[in-house]
């Protein structure tokens, strides 16, 4: 049995091509990438969040220029491959793309340094088509600190959370440290998401979410995307099979996150285990979940329905 659809909350394909120096106009159909229009299964309605990853070392005007260049690249690719992919800003756009047999493409940002410490840039970012922003990467920026430090949100970071909610940009807390996430809990008034994070009780990495954090996100109606990266799935990183990601699924379910769990692959942002290293293996993953006793309703929830419901309610 194959899934009807799949919504993937995170990949780094856009930025990966910029670093590699390849022809950025052709990136979305570059077979050298983990994710390409060719590798996406034609019989699965696919929605992909394409993240503009802004490196931690870029701040201020340099971060703005990098972000603007990446957005221009995204727009070029949407035009070049308009027969196969469609840019989307909401669920209605996504469903129109699916009805036309196209991949639905959402634009996101990984690292709030793209705001360059200026609240007025948040509204502009929304107008550029960005649907979600990861507040930090691993290091520090104007909003706060990532998982390599213990500092929480700055005053600007708290103000940015409120302005993102006002503008209708989804807040992404993946990469944020525990103090920063606690500050988001105090500041945010709307549900938010962790686009690519797993359960720390299963794999003890700082990038993963604690049980207390997961339960609070469930209470708030948030969304959590399973990350396929080995060191976030299994202590030591040596993923042996799909059993390693299933342990996270089972743990999230035990914590009441059955309606809050989604997918956030991290394609082209990390070296992934062989069982999860291609969009073409999505059907194998889906069938595996069913073989482990996950109901079709819950498997559909993980693959697309939980994310679709969340986006319909929260993506302005």
Predicted regions: what they are:
Residues 277-316:
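Mid-to-C-terminal alpha-helical segments outside catalytic/metal-binding sites
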Residues 2-227, 231-236, 246, 250-251, ...:
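Extended, charged catalytic domains and RNA/DNA-binding interfaces, predominantly
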Residues 228, 256-279:
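Short acidic/histidine-rich active-site segments
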Residues 193, 262, 300-304:
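Beta-strand segments within the central parallel beta-sheet cores of soluble alpha/beta enzyme folds
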Residues 16, 270-274, 311:
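Short active-site-adjacent structural elements
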């Amino acid at each position: 049995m194959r899934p009807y659809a799949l919504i993937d909350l995170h990949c780094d394909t856009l930025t990966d091509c910029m670093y590699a120096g390849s022809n950025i106009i052709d990136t979305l159909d570059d077979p050298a990438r983990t994710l390409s229009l060719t590798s996406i299964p034609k019989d699965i309605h696919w929605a992909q969040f394409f993240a503009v990853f802004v490196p931690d070392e870029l701040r201020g005007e340099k971060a703005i220029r990098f972000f603007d260049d990446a957005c221009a690249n995204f727009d070029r690719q949407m035009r070049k491959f308009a027969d196969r992919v469609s840019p989307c800003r909401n669920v209605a756009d996504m469903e129109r793309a699916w009805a036309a047999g196209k991949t639905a493409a959402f634009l996101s940002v990984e690292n709030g340094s793209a705001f360059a410490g200026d609240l007025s840039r948040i509204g502009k970012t929304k107008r550029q088509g960005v649907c979600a922003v990861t507040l930090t990467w691993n290091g520090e920026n104007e909003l706060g600190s990532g998982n390599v430090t213990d500092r929480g949100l700055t005053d600007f970071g708290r103000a940015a959370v409120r302005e993102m909610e006002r503008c209708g940009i989804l807040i992404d807390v993946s990469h944020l440290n525990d103090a920063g996430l606690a500050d988001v809990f105090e500041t945010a008034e709307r549900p938010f998401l962790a686009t690519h994070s797993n359960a720390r009780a299963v794999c003890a990495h700082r990038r993963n979410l604690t049980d207390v954090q997961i339960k609070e996100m469930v209470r708030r109606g948030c969304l959590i995307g399973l990350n396929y990266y080995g060191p976030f799935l299994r202590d030591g990183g040596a993923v042996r099979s799909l059993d390693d990601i299933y342990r996270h699924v089972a743990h999230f379910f035990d914590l009441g996150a059955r309606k809050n769990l989604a997918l956030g692959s991290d394609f082209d942002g990390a070296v992934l285990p062989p069982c999860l290293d291609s969009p073409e293996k999505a059907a194998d993953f889906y069938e595996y979940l069913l073989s482990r006793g996950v109901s079709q309703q819950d498997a559909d929830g993980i693959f697309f329905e939980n994310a679709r419901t969340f986006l319909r309610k929260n993506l302005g």
